[in-house]
């Protein structure tokens, strides 16, 4: 477990799949469509976000490996977050993403943790900035969601920056 001031990140268990599905009414993600297959995949790491004030699970963070060349040392983590609607806008997501980046740097050898979000998702972009991530740029037409292609913004934090 990784504990912050507002939230704690704990191990994801099979009973948490319902939590993931319930947090998905969000136009900027499509987790609900892939919960059964993707969240059982060993290649995706995941932790549940628990609000410290009441001990209630309020969402999850996940990560998967991305590579920037054939050298294994060029691997990085791409992270994602999903919160139940009533937990949004309170700083909980910013802290959870910062804690996840710190956890990944402490437990793996990567030099880079990145996140991407829809160019229109101002709330998540603000959360990433508050978590210590740096905006890098736009990937045009990079994500297929809701029957069309969307541009995404890439944010990152390097080892030693968070």
Residue ranges of predicted features:
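Acyl-donor (CoA/ACP) binding surface of acyl/acetyltransferases
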Residues: 1-28, 46-162
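Short loop/turn motifs at secondary-structure junctions and domain boundaries
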Residues: 38-43, 133
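Short, basic/aromatic recognition patches
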Residues: 34-36
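Short, conserved clusters of charged catalytic residues that mark active-site
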Residues: 31
């Amino acid at each position: 477990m990784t504990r912050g001031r507002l939230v704690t990140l704990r191990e994801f268990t099979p009973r948490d799949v319902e939590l993931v599905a319930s947090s998905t009414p969000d136009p900027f993600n499509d987790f609900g469509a892939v919960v059964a297959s993707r969240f059982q995949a060993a290649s995706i790491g995941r932790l549940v976000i628990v609000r410290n004030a009441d001990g209630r699970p309020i969402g999850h963070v996940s990560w998967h490996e991305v590579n920037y060349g054939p050298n294994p040392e060029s691997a990085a983590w791409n992270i994602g977050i999903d919160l139940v609607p009533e937990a949004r806008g309170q700083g909980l997501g910013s802290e959870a993403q910062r804690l996840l980046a710190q956890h990944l740097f402490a437990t793996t050898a990567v030099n880079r943790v990145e996140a991407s979000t829809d160019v229109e998702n101002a709330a998540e972009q603000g959360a990433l900035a508050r978590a210590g991530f740096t905006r890098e740029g736009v990937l045009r037409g990079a994500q297929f969601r809701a029957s069309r292609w969307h541009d995404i913004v890439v944010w990152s934090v390097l080892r030693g920056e968070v």
